[in-house]
């Protein structure tokens, strides 16, 4: 068990359970993005940078799209043509989401330390991107049947995008921001279970 899982356990213990920890984490996020002096979660208009986690409102305005998440929490991968690519963490089961970020944090700990050293330590916008790839993340998620969580986003359709600092991954993983349009998460998982 690495940093992310240990911190989630600690937050749950401090809050008197995981449900209370989730509520505390959601309050932390809302309070932090509203306060411009706090930089661990900050609004940004930049394109995705690999390895960073973004939370934003989304409206793809595509008439033929059967479903979408209005409020994705995305681990950024790379840019594809004019779109941003990333893993919508909302589509993953809680245990897999925690395991993915725990594994990634442990594997990239030296990069994370370097990317967030000095004044960048608590500044999500200033932290350097990480070296993670589409192929690596696709292979990881495919083992569990959740590679469908890799999604593309049109940058101009994102609103109120916030970036989260690496040290706050445990808090953002606790948050439940999913807001699906057209389906439930169970229906999405059923759609992709036959692949």
Regions found by a protein language model. Give the residues of each.
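Mixed-charge, Lys/Arg-rich low-complexity intrinsically disordered regions
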Residues: 2-53
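Short beta-strand-centered aromatic/proline hotspots
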Residues: 63-81
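Short, solvent-exposed secondary-structure boundary/capping segments
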Residues: 82-92
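Intrinsically disordered, low-complexity, charged/polar segments
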Residues: 93-195
């Amino acid at each position: 068990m690495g940093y992310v899982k240990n911190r989630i356990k600690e937050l749950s213990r401090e809050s008197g359970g995981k449900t209370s920890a989730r509520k505390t984490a959601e309050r932390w996020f809302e309070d932090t993005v509203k306060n411009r002096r706090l930089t661990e979660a900050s609004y940004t208009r930049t394109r995705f940078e690999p390895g960073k986690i973004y939370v934003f409102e989304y409206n793809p305005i595509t008439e033929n799209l059967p479903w979408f998440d209005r409020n994705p929490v995305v681990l950024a991968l790379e840019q594809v043509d004019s779109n941003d690519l990333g893993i919508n963490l909302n589509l993953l089961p809680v245990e897999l989401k925690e395991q993915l970020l725990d594994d990634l944090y442990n594997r990239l700990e030296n990069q994370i330390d370097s990317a967030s050293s000095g004044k960048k330590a608590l500044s999500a916008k200033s932290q350097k991107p990480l070296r993670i790839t589409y192929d690596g993340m696709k292979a990881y998620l495919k083992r569990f049947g959740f590679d469908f969580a890799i999604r593309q986003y049109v940058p101009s359709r994102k609103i109120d995008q916030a970036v989260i600092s690496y040290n706050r991954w445990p808090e953002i993983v606790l948050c439940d921001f999913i807001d699906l349009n057209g389906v439930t998460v169970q229906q999405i998982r059923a759609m992709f279970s036959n692949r």
